[in-house]
Amino acid sequence: MKYNSSLARRIDSNYKKMWIWSIVDVVAVVLAAVFFYLALGLYVVVESGNVSGINPNSNLSMAIIAAIFIFLTLVFFIITLVYAVKFVYNAWKTVARPDDKVTPGWRVFLMFVPVFNVIWAFFFFWEFAKRVNEQLAILNRKQEVSSFAALLYCILNLLSSFAGGLNGMDKKALMASLAEFPLVLFSAILVLGVLNIVSLCLLILWVIQAHSASIEIAETRHNMRAAEIAEGYTA
């Protein structure tokens, strides 16, 4: 779709490139895992002495290919991250206020500050959803970003970070104590996994809604300004 607003075009372009490179990154991760397990399997076979019809150097070749794909996953992840940053930066520009003490650029930067970003997420995702909905209401648009989903994502992100903080504890002592209660250990791992999956789904929902809503705002404002200018010329 062709947009009149340059800001809307930047938002849409970065959004699409972010998804394209993220898909490429996922493919690279899968291929890296496949070749890694092939290399591991061949290594086990070679070490067992059962090398009939197998090139002993095959596992080395597979390991090298796996290493290449692992490197590519890192490269693709960085590219995806760059486009994601550009996307959220431009999206935040659509709801930025003249009296804001924190600019869109700083809002994005603070999301990369360890520990602090867990709290800052509330002022990033949830605040964005509230501002977008306020702007859309003013512009009489039906598009909406779910404030509840954004808030829930921030809360789950906080809980996941807290659970991850257990890594700073004595792991051997922790695992030894939990090993006596395998059901508790399994439940803890299951809950943490579910939290991460739900958080990811909510984040994807936020991104999709933020894309549509921010473009709606950028386009509406651009068209309104264009109409005002045209009216001024004809007056």
Where are the regions a protein language model picked out?
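Membrane-interface extramembranous regions at the lipid-water interface
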Residues: 1-30, 46-54, 59-60, 79-159, ...
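Membrane-helix interface segments in multi-pass membrane proteins
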Residues: 28-76, 147-152, 156-201
